[in-house]
Amino acid sequence: MSKISQLLSNKIQVKIFNRGRQTAVSWVLLVSLGIILALVLPTHAEDTPSPVKLNQQGRNYYSAGKLDQAIETWQQAAAAYTAAGNDRGSRDSYLNTATAQQALGLYDRSCDSLLSAFKITDNSCNQIIEDVQIIEPQLDGIKTLNQKAKSKLLPAIAAINQQPEEQDKVQGLLRFGDYLRASGYPRVANQALELALASSQKLADPQSKTATLLSLGNAQRAIALQKQNQFSTQTIVLDVVANNSGSVTSALESYQPALDYYQQASEVTPRQPDSLKAELNRLSLLLDIQEFWQGAITDFDRHLDSLEINDPEFLQEITTGSKTLKQDLEQRLESEIGNAIAQVEPKVTQLTATRGGIYSRINLAQSLMRRGASDSQTAQILATAVKQARSIKNVTAEAEAMGYLGSLYEQQGQYKSARRLTEGALQLAPTAEYPDIAYRWNAQLGRILAAQGQRVPALFAYETSFNTIRTLRSDLATTPVEPIFREYISLLLQAEPSTSQLAQARDVLESLQVATLDNFFRDPCSEIAEKPVVIDDVDSKAAVIYPILLQDRLEVILTLPGKPLRRYTIPNLTPEKVDNTIRQLRRNALTNPGFAEQIRGARGNPQSATEIAQLKTSQEKSLQQDILPLASEIYSWLIEPAEAELKASEVQTLVFVLDGSLRNIPMALLYDQKEQKYLIQKDYDVALSSGLQLTAPQPLTKHKQPIRVLAAGVTSEFPAYRFPPIPKVEDELNTIKQIFDKSEILLNQEFTKARLEQKLENSDFPVVHLATHGQFGSTADQTFILSGTNQGDPLINVNQFDNLLRAGNLKRSQPIELLVLSACNTAEGDSQAILGLAGVAVRAGARSTLATLWSADDEATANLMGKFYTNLSQNTQVSKARALRKAQLELLMESDSQYRHP
């Protein structure tokens, strides 16, 4: 018997308690309730006994982990205090309610409680989020609450900050900061928390100060993660190695504020629960940093050749710098992590059987599991947590501890014990009563059963987890669920899946697209079609291709008109191989983005014929050597296995629901080496979809009225954003007006957010065409377009843009059928950015989007758009995909064409 097994058999037995309904508790409770309770218990003489008793009951429920009952009781106490005219008691009860709601992850509801606590009636939580979406990007780079930051203070924060210097004010700001951070706005959260810290210092209250420093650490941690996600790992490593001499200090710079706040929190009141939480959070952050940099440097070294550095001296410099950085970081982080464990572990193991102590044990055990520490040591910590939770009858804590103990066994390959513990956790916290716990343990059970070769029960466990996640969509908008979805798809597509399993795999993939959009926008507002769209109902000549990147292979599900689903597999094709191929193709396709300008410039020279010939020879060589082989390889993955069936079904339109890095290149670029044709030259119209759960496409020409376009654009440069002028935009908009004379134009200074909103609200434009600078990044904060205003900030961030389009839709009789973004860039190699681009249209109700995947020549864009709209105007039955394909082919096939590929 292993050491873990001996320990487990000695420490615990899996047994199930009969109990009343309780609501699940997240193991990460960042701020203790004791601060508020200390205020609530000493009541005023004029209070009636009823609210006092209710407050005590709420406290008892909270300590026992019965948070839903605590919330209900404190809400009753607040109502009783209000009826008695006791504002202070009512406020304390609402603050306690908000604390318990946040402990359950119900941050949206905690906002309502906070507004009630401070009687803020002129701001709803929805309005607060709309304001935050504007303020958050403006605070990027502002490290302290200086005068500029204070001028952008959220009205609700300002209202709380105007309260007298009392504990209630500190707690209100603290809870509001935690709410904003959890909602995805850590910079605005930081404002509230800095004000809370200042108040706690004025009150000389060490407990409040500790809690606030802890929350500031959490906010700064979220900011550091956002910064980390802004750039590729290669860019981050290269910046540190090339520009900062491989400095460890530089590598840790974005994380240092969070580490410092955690350290300060642990020192103010060393024996308090929040101090211990700060130490545990600091340890987990150090592990996050270590894992990120290990992966980043490994990825950088692996792809160093793809950077195409021609200077041998510089190449040697960064190669050496990368190696040195890796060694120095490893030494520094190993030392800090070791010291952190040595300091916190003795404190945790001495904790008594309280709710906070149990979750501290679970927190430490998770870090030790990531660290690869002694299995018996970690098992002992978790076994004690199970025993303590049982002793105080805290079922949720017991289920959490037991589930993580099962995870430890799973890591060690002891699947029999892992299964027993995981099933025990699910019996304690069944799906119907504890969905936000159970979805994780059901997925874990699915993995364990699959490892034991029990595919059918494993599929059932995964299906339960998947269905639970869908019901929890509103609560999991910022929670990554991708690993669970991909594990489930992989299992569904093993061996010879049935038609129903193929359909389920397709549905799971589409749900993953929805979840990714929810995570991108930080809320679950991507509208799902009430009824899944059957492609035959939309286009009887269309096929849908679903490539799915799995750990060890590429799977493709094919939907053909009127036929059962089929699937084909490309074995041993890993996501890394796909990523490398896509990255190289994209880079090669953009090696000389100025080629068109060079051709045009050469036409005016005396030796133009010779120069043009040389340019074309060079570019043709690059095309044959660097682009077509890679485009052909991807074609062989996605199209070649289905060619015969596509022809037999007389398919005319290929709709791609792309996965991962496959979103980073246009499918029109795929190349059939046998026929020596691009995909769009093979009589296929090409369209992309973010998933038919999300869209119900309709022909643009369904409208009987003449097509009207709202066309807005900017020609000027924006030095602050490093965007050059795009002079051909004016020609582009004028061409649209010539083709569709009922269209309206907003150019340069006429193109403001207010004018755009007015036009969208007052007129039904089936097409909205925006020819302006913009960027789509991996998060909503990095995604924006620029208006032409010369007063104030020209930036329209993605949430403002989303609100503009949605507000217009509320007053429109018809939705926007086509949204065109003809000059925007997507972040290089960022597949989520492309999905986010499509998501803007999906959420706003626009049925189709046409946009550039990378920086395009403005004259080429103007020409393409002119041909595209001409095609739409000449044939009222033509689809948008057909009109675009025809325009692309016209540019490619022109004599003396300056364009090499789609």
Question: Residues of each region from the PLM?
Answer:
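N-terminal secretory signal peptides that target proteins for export/translocation
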Residues: 1-20
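Alpha-helical solenoid repeat scaffolds used for protein-protein interaction
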Residues: 115-118, 122-139, 146, 154-158, ...
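Alpha-helical segment of the N-proximal tetratricopeptide repeat
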Residues: 52-69, 80, 179, 244-247, ...
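Classical Sec-dependent N-terminal signal peptides that target proteins to the secretory pathway
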Residues: 19-41
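N-terminal leader/linker segments that initiate helical-solenoid repeat arrays
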Residues: 34-76, 83-84, 88-92
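Catalytic cores of enzymes
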Residues: 537-572, 606-623, 627-902
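Short, charge-rich amphipathic alpha-helical segments embedded
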Residues: 77-94, 103, 513-522
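Non-membrane alpha-helical segments in proteins
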Residues: 52-63, 88-103, 130, 137, ...
